[in-house]
Amino acid sequence: MIDAIQSVGAFSNLKEAEGTSLTASTALSLPSAGASAPQSQSFAEVLGTMTTDAIRSMKSAEGVSLQAIRGEANTREVVDAVMNAEQSLQTALAIRDKVVTAYLEIARMQI
């Protein structure tokens, strides 16, 4: 179910064009104590990482739910996984709403 959502994502085309997959893990790196300049990421990379984490969270919740149906997971594990996935989804929706609002404001500007 989540794989279908992943193929529709806006970042799947971007990552495939760059030669990497959306499912590839891209973690945020913290600069080391001896580093002279902090390493920055582009906005697309940050959103891609957040999207990957949200998809991974939803897949995990789906897997735990299936384990519970088979009797291999208890209720607490299912609730924790589903709540984590719900929080990730709510964050993604909030970011989407902010991006759409910003786009609409830019579109209304007179040039």
Curated annotation (Swiss-Prot):
Location relative to the cell: Bacterial flagellum basal body
Subcellular location, principal: other
GO cellular component: bacterial-type flagellum basal body
Domain of life: Bacteria
Keywords: Bacterial flagellum
Statement: the UniProt record of this protein carries the keyword Metal-binding: no
HAMAP family: FliE
Record-stated family: Belongs to the FliE family.
Name of the protein this chain belongs to: Flagellar hook-basal body complex protein FliE
Protein species of origin: Sinorhizobium fredii (strain NBRC 101917 / NGR234)
Name of the encoding gene: fliE
